[in-house]
């Protein structure tokens, strides 16, 4: 209970809220594809990534695996950009609305991946978000995966393995 309501920087935990929005709106469409937009490449350059390159085609599911196994910023931003038709501010607004619907009271979301220092949350809010995510079979499956093999893509001649950064696995 001590400090459980204290607002702290959300950092990479922001991706869980992006994941919640994706699963809420698109859980039955995870095999749909999108092309990684060039527009987000500068924003995520030299940050946590899964080497998902602009112009390559991915399924939503592949992006979710990249987000959860490698904390991949380009996956979160690419999905947000694509699913919002380039309206990242609108996506963030939807994140904040869903967050409040889940019951969070101390969280503020300002981007889809956590690079912006304005993303804040509390321990209680993260518990609520994770409890919400547990409703989705895709989250349970993806979050428990120690590895994911990304298929060959337009700029990757061979498949490659993403090793989870989750030390609990």
Where do the protein language model's features map onto the residues?
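Active-site-adjacent loops and short helices of periplasmic peptidoglycan-processing enzymes
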Residues: 1-124, 133-137
């Amino acid at each position: 209970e001590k400090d459980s309501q204290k607002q702290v920087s959300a950092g990479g935990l922001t991706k869980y809220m992006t994941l919640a929005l994706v699963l809420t709106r698109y859980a039955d469409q995870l095999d749909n594809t999108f092309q990684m937009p060039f527009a987000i490449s500068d924003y995520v350059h030299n940050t946590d990534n899964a080497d998902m390159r602009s112009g390559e085609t991915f399924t939503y599911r592949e992006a979710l695996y990249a987000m959860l196994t490698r904390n991949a910023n380009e996956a979160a931003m690419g999905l947000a950009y694509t699913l919002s038709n380039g309206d990242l501010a609108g996506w963030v607004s939807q994140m904040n609305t869903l967050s409040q619907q889940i019951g969070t009271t101390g969280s503020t979301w300002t981007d889809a991946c956590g690079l912006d220092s304005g993303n804040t949350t509390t321990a209680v809010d993260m518990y609520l978000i994770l409890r919400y995510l547990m409703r989705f079979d895709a989250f349970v499956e993806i979050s428990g995966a120690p590895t994911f093999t990304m298929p060959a893509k337009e700029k990757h001649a061979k498949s490659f393995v993403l090793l989870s950064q989750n030390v609990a696995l």
